[in-house]
Amino acid sequence: MQEKAVVLDDQMIRRALTRISHEIVERNKGVDNCVLVGIKTRGIFIAQRLAERIGQIEGKEMEVGELDITLYRDDLTLQSKNKEPLVKGSDIPVDITKKKVILVDDVLYTGRTVRAAMDALMDLGRPSQIQLAVLVDRGHRELPIRADYVGKNIPTSSEERIEVDLQETDQQDRVSIYDK
């Protein structure tokens, strides 16, 4: 797998997350009834960063949850090859019923991860609204899902892969395109 290009560096990621934070505050007229829920793994770190920025903007701490969608994926049998899935568990510190839940993920591609996340959320409560924030939207949707907040649209071919590196897991912040 060969890297073709770095499409977002650390400064570009920082700016995109700051913009998304402002958009979340503006669209929801504040964040009083909102909860950020990151989809494991990188979505959690992006959600935490958004919460930090929103806290600076609004002067309020925002609740952040972690969502494990392992058992909700429709491609589980394709990935597992007769192995038991590794379930890490979800941790959402508040009742999401009647709250605006902002799902957060690193890359939006086919929409299947988001569909699985919505199924998992509905098992935990009944939010008044679900919104979606992603760092990168690369297109190629298989389901009718659209992000409400996008850091960067990066059109790709199906022969390319987007990789998001974050300081928390990869010791650097960047988004790259690779040939498969």
UniProtKB/Swiss-Prot annotation:
Catalytic activity: UMP + diphosphate = 5-phospho-alpha-D-ribose 1-diphosphate + uracil
GO biological process entries: DNA-templated transcription termination
Keywords (A to Z) from UniProt: Glycosyltransferase, RNA-binding, Transcription, Transcription regulation, Transcription termination, Transferase
A Gene Ontology molecular function term of the record: uracil phosphoribosyltransferase activity
Motif (PRPP-binding): 101-113
Enzyme class name: transferase
Keyword Glycosyltransferase: yes
Gene3D superfamilies reported for this sequence: 3.40.50.2020
EC number(s) on file: 2.4.2.9
InterPro entries: PRibTrfase_dom, PRTase-like, PyrR, PyrR_bifunctional
Pfam families in alphabetical order: Pribosyltran (PF00156)
Top-level taxon in the UniProt lineage: Bacteria
Assembly behavior: Homodimer and homohexamer; in equilibrium.
Family: Belongs to the purine/pyrimidine phosphoribosyltransferase family. PyrR subfamily.
Function field: Regulates transcriptional attenuation of the pyrimidine nucleotide (pyr) operon by binding in a uridine-dependent manner to specific sites on pyr mRNA. This disrupts an antiterminator hairpin in the RNA and favors formation of a downstream transcription terminator, leading to a reduced expression of downstream genes.
Name this protein carries in UniProt: Bifunctional protein PyrR
Taxonomic lineage from the root: Bacteria, Bacillati, Bacillota, Bacilli, Bacillales
Gene this protein is translated from: pyrR
